[in-house]
Amino acid sequence: MIRTGFDEMYEADGQVRPHYRAFARWLAETPDELLAQRRREADLLFHRAGITFTLYGDEQGTERLIPFDTIPRSIPASEWRVVERGCIQRVKALNMFLADLYHEQRIIRAGIIPAEQVLANEQYQLAMQGLDLHRDIYAHICGVDLVRDGDGTYYVLEDNLRTPSGVSYMLEDRKMMMRLFPELFAAQRIAPIDHYPNLLLDTLRSASPLDDPSVVVLTPGRFNSAFFEHAFLAREMGVELVEGADLFVRDDKVFMRTTDGPKAVDVIYRRLDDAFLDPLAFNPDSMLGVPGLLSSYRSGNVVLANAIGTGVADDKSVYPFVTDMIKFYLDEEPILKNVPTWQCRNPAELSHVLANLPDLVVKETQGSGGYGMLVGPAATTAQIDAFRERIKAKPHAYIAQPTLSLSTCPTFVENGIAPRHIDLRPFVLSGRETRVVPGGLTRVALREGSLVVNSSQGGGTKDTWVVED
């Protein structure tokens, strides 16, 4: 059983952890009214900058501010180095799995992953079978979601290999903290993160075999929940932000419409799902994609980052096999552990899940954003019974895990400061080399007792510091 109750700032006896001592002294010496004023300034600055997300399912389609908490999540550098190595190891194995899956399928023949687990997965793309990619990289940009147990051990909760979001909030949170509290950064060595856009652009350029490829960011448009991030990253990289209608394919090559005439496009950082990329190949009703894009991609005339078909590797039903992938492809022991997982597609595991629903977290294998899940200890009897019937009807569509009490971090709440549950999403870039910007996005569940940190479910964010020991 995974233990729970780890606080990022305080030891079990209430003493401040060494890497938080400088911040704790500053917090104790700073008047409450000044802290409140700075928090109000942060809200105003975020609003002026347009740092919002769209809440799907909201009747008004409301754009909302991402709540930002000014107490940072701090990680000692020695601890971070382990996390960094673990994330790099994991993403390397996942890329090797994708290259293998779409070619020789050695891992299936070795009996490590059942064929039906991946080949019948709706995220598996037959169009990618046998297609060679530059450097054999499928997932150029990845987000690895981490949580901690009671003794501070990191566990990977899930991998995000399709269109991981949140990095713009990571960067804006840091800008905000440096603007509002410059004295904190002068008092200790905090690893910088402002070079991420340059690393991202270098990663995208290196995805092409060309010496000087042209890069664009493809967005579904301003009504997408992450549109702020799409525009932010395009601006920071100095590349064009385009929608599907801005691009066209001629002679199996992709061009961008400009006032000076067509301009060739070599690399597309796409922020829309596979199904909407090309109405000729996938969803014929898509108005967001580019007709003929798949043909151009298969001809090697354009690079897509991330590649089509990466979703099969971050599907929740494939998650339990990632540690086996690391051993199989890298011949290494996993640095970061998986959360124990029961697959409802297996009859014996299904029986265990159905018998223990009040104690488990159950997730749809295709779910995301905190939707399509049951948190047993927080659910009513009626909700548990309804979920039991859904699982029985489609057992292959669900996995279950023990309920984790995510680590907590002191957070400003209405009545002062209180612990709130957090997770961490480091961003991993795979190009000529695999790199991770120090820290990542810390998400915080602002509702007391809540374990759901997603912004779509009322979660907020914190700046993440990697502090020299």
Predicted regions and their residues:
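Preference for protein termini
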Residues: M1-D469
